[in-house]
Structure formats: structure tokens, C-alpha cells
Amino acid sequence: MDPFPLVAAALFIAATWFITFKRRRNLPPGPFPYPIVGNMLQLGSQPHETFAKLSKKYGPLMSIHLGSLYTVIISSPEMAKEIMHKYGQVFSGRTIAQAVHACDHDKISMGFLPVGAEWRDMRKICKEQMFSHQSMEDSQNLRKQKLQQLLEYAQKCSEEGRGIDIREAAFITTLNLMSATLFSMQATEFDSKVTMEFKEIIEGVASIVGVPNFADYFPILRPFDPQGVKRRADVYFGRLLGLIEGYLNERIEFRKANPNAPKKDDFLETLVDALDAKDYKLKTEHLTHLMLDLFVGGSETSTTEIEWIMWELLASPEKMAKVKAELKSVMGGEKVVDESMMPRLPYLQAVVKESMRLHPPGPLLLPRKAESDQVVNGYLIPKGAQVLINAWAMGRDPSLWKNPDSFEPERFLDQKIDFKGTDYELIPFGSGRRVCPGMPLANRILHTVTATLVHNFDWKLERPEASDAHKGVLFGFAVRRAVPLKIVPIKA
């Protein structure tokens, strides 16, 4: 018997084992994975907290296995800067969840498109047109009208002595503010059936995108859609895209029929202008999917953050008093804050930053993917690896923040730290080329809604015995309170 084939096979196996072992030694450290499931059984209900604990043992550049999905967890500003800035091109890809394939969203959405010509055009239209300083200034009166509506609703509840579900009120107001800015229209009314329909669709999309899906970790299951995620996503995405397409087509037809009519100061007008001028190589479907991203991402994250801000202020009466005093000194007898007042409200800004530090709405940001092998801090991150940035862990790191678990807005009065993507210890909106495009609008919404609620009313819990309910949270697209915050407005 010729021994050569056996020797060759043995050498091949040995070489493969050696290369694999050497490659494994160069990967970031992490807990040992179990067969098939990897480290999934270790995650618990709050993965961001689990990752933070594990990073204390394995370091700020850590690897785990989520089923067959190899994942690297980043837990320090230094490593976040390496990923998002120094090697931003390499880590500009996205891991695409099965739900995002609904209605081909992954092929059209700016949030999930690979960095290329289409992505650059969409990014450019956001930066230069939709969210430019001038565009935001032009549309602020539309938003002020919606803040007045929130004020009137709270006044009515105050007169009747009934509590407000802050999450629901913030959701409706955020949706109205976004609808006014995008379409010059009011999407929802308080206490209406239309409200519940919008709430159902947008929260449906958010919950499906945020729910753990076995098919994302075991690709062999994707064709079977065992949890029905893709089927449900197709329904919710389709309904929301249908509404948005209706608004866009209605505006296009109106412009054709009334070419001399005055233009509106909203984003939709800007987008139709861009389509007409052919300044960007984009189609109508790109814009409808962009609007979907803005509605779902903006309304869900802003709503969640406003609820956390109000909880923290309610739990810290002295902080609430400081915000009220500052607002009174700047606003005087005005009931609705003007966006131009924001630079004169440093304590309000500090409150929002501190809440974002403690409660980043998306604690792990949107997942990134390595487009090629890359060595970071001496460790190999292989092509195709998912990369998660644990913004929550960085916000609670005692080496970065004094008393990290305490709500202390004053820390931001002494530090020139912002959440716009250059200070990596505070990046709730991300950073680099994948930073959230809607951040300028979200920033204004968070400050103006908080100011309107705090300036005009004192607040008390509807059920004081529920004061410890903030301890439970629900992990998903955004990490929200497990028990909705219901508080009673008292006319100040």
C-alpha cells in the first residue's frame, strides 16, 4: 500500500490544525464557547450588562460566539475610536438581521447599505439638505406648534387630575414633531384611533427588529423562519412604507398640478426638489425607506430617552428644581421653549447628556461588520465578524466617570463632552461615517419636549408605591423601562 496519500492527508490535517490554532490564539480573548450555541446561554435578558461584566475579565476587546456568528465586543473609548475612526472603512459594513430583509429594506436603506455611491448620495442629502442647520431652522415653527399641542394635552390632564403615560405622550409628540418636520402634517392626535394605529405599526417594526431571532445566529434556519419574524416584518414594513409612499406621491402630484404654489418648509419639499433636479442618483424608493428609518429609529429612541429623563428628574427633586429655575430665568412667561434658547440652557443640556450616559437608547448601537481581516490592539478581527460597541458599558465605567451609577448632570457643566460622535466615552448616536443621520433633529426633540414638560408643570407619580419600578428594563431595539412611567401633571 502506498503510504503517500496517508502521509499527505496527515500533513494537511496537521497544517490546518496549526493554522486554525494560531489564528485562534490571535483572536480577542473571551469566554469559551459551547458547541453549537456558543455563548448564547450566558447572555441573560440584558446582554449589554452581561457584556460589561465579561469585559472586566477579558478586556475592552472581547470575542464571543452567538451560535455560529462570531462577534467582537468593544467596551472602551480607545477601542471604539479604533473601530469607528482609525479603521472606520474596514468596519463600515453591517450585520443584517433577517427582519431587515423585509421589503428589501437591507438593499435600499441607508442604515444597512454598504458604503458606496448610493450610500454616499443618501448621506449627502441628509447632511446637506434634510438635516442642515438652515433646514432645521426653517422647520422649527412647525415643531413649535406640536409642542403647543403637548402642552394643551398635559393641561387637560392636569385639570382632570389624571396621570399621563409619559412613554405614550412622548411617542405621540415625537411622531408629531417628526411628521411636521418631514411632511408639514400632523400624524396623530392624542387619545385617537389613528394614534393607536401609528403606535402599533412603528412599535411593531421596532419590536421585530429588536427581538432575538434564532435564524440570525443559525443561518441554516433562515429559510424556515421558525419564529415568524420575517413574515411579521413584511407586514409591518409594508404598512409603514405604504403610508410614507402615499405622502410622497401626494406631494409629487400636487407639485405637478400646482407648479406655482408656495413651497412648504419641510424635508419632503427638499427631497422632491432633489429628485426633480436629479442632483442625486436616487429613486423614490430610496427616500421612502430613508423615511422609514427616520420614523422608526427616531420615534422609538427619542420616546425611550424622554421617559428616562423624566424618571431621573422625578427621582432627583433637587435636579428637577435646578432645571425649572433655569427654564424660568430664560423663558420667563413663555410656555413653549424656542429652539434658539438652547445655548442659554446649559443645565438642561447637562440633564439630557447625563440621561444619555446612563440610558443610551440603543446600548449596543447598530452592529457593524468587518469587511476584511484587521488587526486591532494586537488582536485579529476576521473578515465577516460582527462588531458591537457597548455604549452602555462605557457610560457606566468607573475609570471614566466618578459615581458612574448616579444621576449627576453637574458633571457636564465642568467637562466639554458632547454626544455628537467625537467624545467616544459618550456615543449614544454612534460615530464616524455610520453616525446617526437624524441626530440634529433628535437633539432638538429631546431638549424641547423635556423643557415643555418641566417648565409648565410640577409632577408626581400616579402610584407612589411604584417608585422602585424603574429597576426593571426591557431589552430590544431600544432599552425601555419595563413598567411605563405614569405621572400626574400639577400646574406650576
From Swiss-Prot:
Q: Where in the cell is it found?
A: Membrane
Ligand binding (heme): 436
Q: What is its main location?
A: membrane
Membrane topology, from the record: Single-pass membrane protein
Among Gene3D superfamilies, the record links this protein to:
Cytochrome P450
Give coiled-coil spans as residue ranges: none
Q: Which Pfam families match?
A: p450
**For this chain's UniProt record, which GO biological process terms are given?**
diterpenoid biosynthetic process
| Name used for this protein in its record | Ferruginol synthase
Which organism is the protein's source?
Salvia fruticosa (Greek sage)
